[in-house]
Structure formats: C-alpha cells, structure tokens
Amino acid sequence: MADNEQSSIVCDNGSGMVKAGFSGDDAPRHVFPSIVGRPKNMQAMMGSANKTVYVGDEAQSKRGVLSLKYPIEHGIVTNWDDMEKIWHHTFYNDVRVNPEQHNVLLTEAPMNPKQNREKMTQIMFETFNVPSLYIGIQAVLSLYSSGRTTGIVLDAGDGVTHTVPIYEGYSLPHAVRRVDMAGRDLTEYLMKIMMETGTTFTTTAEKEIVRNVKEQLCYVALDFEEEMTNSAKSANEEAFELPDGNVMMVGNQRFRCPEVLFKPSLIGLDEAPGFPEMVYQSINKCDIDVRRELYGNIVLSGGSTMFLNLPERLAKEISNLAPSSIKPKVVAPPERKYSVWIGGSILSSLTTFQTMWVKKSEYDESGPSIVHNKCF
C-alpha cells in the first residue's frame, strides 16, 4: 500500500526495538533500537553539530561517546520525555509523515498500568495532534498475524514475556501470565557469565556488543544436562570478533544464557515460572472445553523466541506438564520477530476496524480515560 492519505501509521514500541511503518504493508519499514543517547562529555562531541540527544541507530553508532538509556523498561515507559523523542524521530525522521494527517496504531503489553496507556493517549493527541488512535495488545496482534482467532500466544521481547490465551478473537484476561523477564535479562546474564572468559563488559555500549553475541551465537539446549556434559568433553567454542578487532571465544555460555527462559531461578527469579510453566498455567486457567484447542495452537512471537531449538524444547517440556492424551503443537512463524507489527498492519487496514479508532473529538470530550473504553 502506498503511504497515501488513507494509510495509518503502525508503531510497535518494544522495550528493545521500535518497529514502524504503514498499515497494509507486510513488514515494518523501519526497525531501530528504542534508545536515547546523550554525550558523556560535551567537549568530546565538538564538531558534531553539538547535538545533545541522539535516537535509535544514530545513538547506537556513536555509542562509544554516549550514555545510552532505554525509556521503556519491562514494557512500561519509565521516561516520557525520552519516549516523546523516540516518537518524534519515528514520525519525522523514519516514516517521514506528519502525524496530524494519519491515524496511529500503537501497541502495549497486557496488564500494563492504566496510567501508562492514558499517558500514551495524551501525548499522541496533545503533542502530536493525531486524528485518531488505537492501542493494541501485543500478543493479540501476533495471533492475528498468524491467521488464527484461537490460540495461546507466548510473546517474549526485550522487556516482558507474556502468555495470552485467545478464543474466537477474544483474549481471556483472567488467564494471562506476565513475567518481567525477557531479552534484556538474558543480555545482562550473558554479560555476567562472559566474565569467565576473562572479558569484562560494563558500559552501556559494551552491553550492546553482548546483545549482538546473544543474537548471533546463542541457542537453546534440547537437554541442558547432556549439553553441559558434552561441552565439558569438547569445547564447542565459537569465535566472535569484537569492534576493536580482538576475537573472543564463546563456549557453553552460548546455551547457558537462553536456559534462563526455562529456569528463571538462574538469575534469582526463584518464584517466576519458565516458558513451559507459563503456557501450562495460562491454559489451566481457561475453561476445560477450550484447553485442547489452545494446546494445539501455541504461537510464538517476539525476538526472544528466535533461539535455535527453542520451539522443540518448549513442545517437549509442555508435553511433560500436559495431560498424557494431549500433543502440544508449537507454531513458530519465521517472521515472529515482527508479528506484533504485522498484526497491527493487518488490523488497521480492515474496513471493519475503522469504527474502533479513538477519535480526537472523543478524546477532547472525555479525556485520556476514553482509551479504556475502545481499546481492549
């Protein structure tokens, strides 16, 4: 779809990455890190047009001289000034449109505090003057993008992991599980266990290097104990070239890092359920008649589900928890890194959806709380 007058802006603001583009497109046009960078030392930045704030890729490329901050933590905006800068960058520098002329669909994690959603609404209508707004629940959008109306979505991004059962298009809020453990926690754990190799990572810039190591080299062990035994016998190391040209060898850290997704106690979250338990607990909170169908449609979504072997390990562990007659089916769409965005693109281009937008006139009349009436 051309970015004509009719197309809406779809913006999936993740804790780690912003995905932005136009409704009707099959993929986001712009994907950049949700980071805002400020110079550590103003003198050091002389001659670079003296900008005081850098956003996204530009902040990433200058990370050596900047202090980087993520305004979204665990799916909740913790710094609204920086969040506004990210949205401004999205509209004017990336999708390059005037938000006053396009409806905007934003996304958020389930069980977010109400005031988070109200503040998003307020900024969109008052700062950016958008004509209409909709805020969609991330997991529900992912299910739409997989072409299903019934299933349980396990959505794991950078800040939050949640399991959301959906039946005939309706999410079942009483059965949602949310754990504030996701990709960023894996990166921090990897930073910690990489110290065993003799390399220390401490700065915000070095954290980004470790995130790259995680995304490029880590995988899930199908059997953790067996993998540990094997790695003790043969190193199974992979080389990773650091930005300064030095090469670092990464060994059993490659599978110990994502193991956190199955054993959150590794990072001190003793009470938190791992991925298999989250799915199992969510399904068990649903009506007995829909459980079998949910077990047959476990849909993965988000960047932290991209690890090699994760779908297979998840299916194996869920079938150990589920009743013996049930054969769980884990669906891992190849585009699942962006399935929240794709679902938003599909939803906002449906003619039947057009009555769902919160209009500026409704906002002016009722204030930010209007968003709870129209966005579920």
Curated annotation (Swiss-Prot):
It is an enzyme of class 3 (hydrolase). Its EC number is 3.6.4.-. Pfam families: Actin. It catalyses: ATP + H2O = ADP + phosphate + H(+). Keywords: ATP-binding, Cytoplasm, Cytoskeleton, Hydrolase, Nucleotide-binding. It is found in: Cytoplasm, Cytoskeleton. It comes from the Eukaryota. Its main location: cytoplasm. SMART domains: ACTIN (SM00268). GO terms for cellular component: cytoplasm; cytoskeleton. GO terms for molecular function: ATP binding; hydrolase activity. InterPro entries: Actin, Actin/actin-like_CS, Actin_CS, ATPase_NBD. Belongs to the actin family. Actins are highly conserved proteins that are involved in various types of cell motility and are ubiquitously expressed in all eukaryotic cells. This is Actin.
